[in-house]
Amino acid sequence: MRTYSNKLIAIMSVLLLACLIVSGCSSSQNNNGSGKSESKDSRVIHDEEGKTTVSGTPKRVVVLELSFLDAVHNLGITPVGIADDNKKDMIKKLVGSSIDYTSVGTRSEPNLEVISSLKPDLIIADAERHKNIYKQLKKIAPTIELKSREATYDETIDSFTTIAKALNKEDEGKEKLAEHKKVINDLKAELPKDENRNIVLGVARADSFQLHTSSSYDGEIFKMLGFTHAVKSDNAYQEVSLEQLSKIDPDILFISANEGKTIVDEWKTNPLWKNLKAVKNGQVYDADRDTWTRFRGIKSSETSAKDVLKKVYNK
């Protein structure tokens, strides 16, 4: 009888242990499933500072550069805060209509107190301008730091892709880039097959003239369209005198000028200017300062490309 009881106790112990093991496995699976769900809702975003984790779909976004506004707007989001240099008309010009947002100051010195008051769930900052305030921004909200001000065209595309991922809109981002590529390719097809002239854009300020070389943002747009660039260089920008410009002697010259009088106004009476091929052949064109050199987004690059064809070929 005692032997029977011992056997029964042993059997019951085994069954109890089995139940505990099964229960533990079930609990572990449930926990793992929950973990996977949370992981799926969070994304690790790699940026110029390393990596940042962004959760869910950000709704309250603050952008500190104009190309980032171009990106988020094209992805269907209106930022709650924009570093607009206190120029609401410039923002309207970029997005094509008036939008409701709060100015967070200038791109060079955004107001951290105002940014914090907006309670953002994502801040998009420039790798060059905002490097020194990155840690402060990070304390306010998840912050990604990307290239804009010093970005090439390809780096602008990379930044757009990263922003789409951060906003949980990767598929939409891919669609937008495919549409953008088609626009550029269609414009490229309009360039005459026998076009062999070279081209360059210069930024005219009160006391200086800076050429944007083949490795600059707009220089890459010229190349994408099929033009030969007049200044091939690994340095994106090259400040030149009138004498140096006359040696380069571009066939086509686009000039993006600051407000007010510029150094070009002085040059226009100089024989060196008058003898430039672009001047003699009527191939000097204005380039909108905002669209060509400040906005630096995918939509503004399309506008710039269309501007070239319209002005050079009347298309």
From Swiss-Prot:
* One CC-aspect GO term: plasma membrane
Q: Where is the signal peptide?
A: 1-18
Q: Does the keyword Lyase apply?
A: no
Q: Where is the composition biased (Basic and acidic residues)?
A: 37-51
Cellular compartments annotated: Cell membrane
Lipid (N-palmitoyl cysteine) attached at which positions?
19
Q: Which SUPFAM superfamilies match?
A: Helical backbone' metal receptor
Question: Keywords in UniProt for this one?
Answer: Cell membrane, Ion transport, Iron, Iron transport, Lipoprotein, Membrane, Palmitate, Signal, Transport
Residues covalently joined to lipid (S-diacylglycerol cysteine): 19
Region described as Disordered: 27-52
Q: Which residues form the Fe/B12 periplasmic-binding domain?
A: 60-315
Which residues, by range, are in coiled-coil regions? none
Membrane topology, as annotated, equals: Lipid-anchor
Q: Which Pfam families match?
A: Peripla_BP_2
Kindly summarize what the UniProt induction comment says about this protein's expression. Transcriptionally regulated by fur.
- What does the protein in this record do? Part of the ABC transporter complex YfmCDEF involved in citrate-dependent Fe(3+) import. Binds citrate-dependent Fe(3+) and delivers it to the surface of YfmDE.
Q: How does it assemble?
A: The complex is composed of one ATP-binding protein (YfmF), two transmembrane proteins (YfmD and YfmE) and a solute-binding protein (YfmC).
In Swiss-Prot or TrEMBL terms, this protein is called Fe(3+)-citrate-binding protein YfmC
Tell me which species this is from. Answer: Bacillus subtilis (strain 168)
Gene of this entry:
yfmC
